[in-house]
Amino acid sequence: MNGRREFHFVFGLRPQREPFHLVHWLALESCRRTQAPDAIHLHCRHVPWGPWWDRIAPHLAVHRVGAAPPGFDPSRYAQSVEGRLVAERGYDYAHEADFLRLEILRDGGGAYADIDTLFVARYPDAWFSHDCVLGEEPPIAGPDGVLKPSLCNAVILARPGSRFLARWLDEARLSFDGTWSRHSCAAAARLWCEAPGELHVLPGRAFYRHGPNRAGLAALFEQRDDRLAGVASLHLWAHLWWDERRIDFTRFHAGLVTPEWIARGEATVAAVARPYLG
């Protein structure tokens, strides 16, 4: 193993009008409990607040984010229907975080995880020795309907000065056009095809056992999946269900994630999260 087990999260790029949510606390607490981290870093522009924040803050190194990173240009949202939809739904913070995570890991190395990650098992030390590690996600259909490989950026491990991350960051800055993932997941897959030796790819099960679709969200929040062998963490795809008004994937929403639901619930997320509340 090269380097320390440092974990990085990005949050609070927009003003925080609501208290820090239990889902986000679970991401940090499950990391603390399962990963034996040398440090957990939270990178934020606006510091979170609330009871769950007060409970986890002593275990974190908090870093303030300044100006938007190079390459993140909100003016590009106007160039496409998809980009305008991203801006309209307020998902621009996710794009800024796409650039920040690459800069953070390029400079310091370690592991990055989205703050809607629920850790299940310790990430092996060997993963930290690779130049860069990503997990595959379900393939994405191109304009011609042909499925193309995609590598999700919700969990990334990398060494400081990673060659792959440097190439990815350059590509992201060139290709960002306001659409959801051309600069991120799709760009990573393109670069992997060009230079497969620079990247260690894990099967989707490691980080993305349940996909960003109706069946995947049902398996996470309505059903019980005990077949978690080989699963290191669960990505919860929070943007697809967080708002109670969004029901195209599920009627589950953030307001339903409470200590009581975790204590008594039978769904996969409740069962995995339950020990962390103890």
Give the ranges of each region predicted by the language model.
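Small-residue hinge/turn detector
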Residues: 98-110
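Glycosyltransferase-associated regions of secretory-pathway enzymes
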Residues: 1-97, 115-278
